[in-house]
């Protein structure tokens, strides 16, 4: 079992964020209360007087803020624009991905970026977007990290929560069926079904963790270890506190959903090594979710590597997966036992 801190992979960043946020990320301790969180926030998001508590010492406004990335990512538009440009460049170099249906619904498609190597491993990526936005094409910029290293890269399209009446069970089922499809059809595009990996960011990391804690033998009549490893970046693994936040405005949380789709409660089904990661400039609640998930995996006796990206906010953190020399890019290639490509993408 391996647990590592990112001291050896820290990357110096330019000072993108306001001083209050930078100070916050450095000062936040391993346990951050709602009261402590208040003093780190920029003036424009300072909470009103405290209301009734809804979770631990968080009131409703504080729990909403704890799961809202907007105040913590002042450069979100710049990141989105940059990634769109990098995605267009990647597709221009690699060519349009093969878009193939894994189910009958119009949205149920995978986009496959193939490597030139035969019988190659496959990384399946699940996009984030707070369960209500995002799509497979939006992470095309990550594809070259894998293709150049000798792996196929597959991004998955699935419904967003508002499209399925707020039911995350539908989205989880789609993701599982997509993975099962890739396993059964891997050889048709030169993939090795016995080297299947899953990765995800934010709400996609939650869905990746759901996939990693699925009983594949019971539910799909597939090998129990269909997935060989996984990477979960900045996800949510216990849905109870999330259900108390503004997310409940578009996700219809139920006790059954919270129980079935909280990966931290099903670690007995986790059979493979995972990487859990978050940025040091993320909200304290996101940091806590990932820190506690990694600790729970370790306590369960399962292999886990825990990474903290110093100087990275929520969006910048998973952006490093689009560079083979980035924190996540290097980590996932090492997890897949692949060499970093000889040349980094421009």
Model-derived features: positions:
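N-terminal secretory signal peptides
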Residues: 1-11, 22-25
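Sec-dependent N-terminal signal peptides
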Residues: 18-20
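Boundary at the C-terminal end of the N-terminal hydrophobic targeting segment
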Residues: 32-34
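Alpha/beta-hydrolase superfamily serine-hydrolase fold, recognizing
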Residues: 36-346
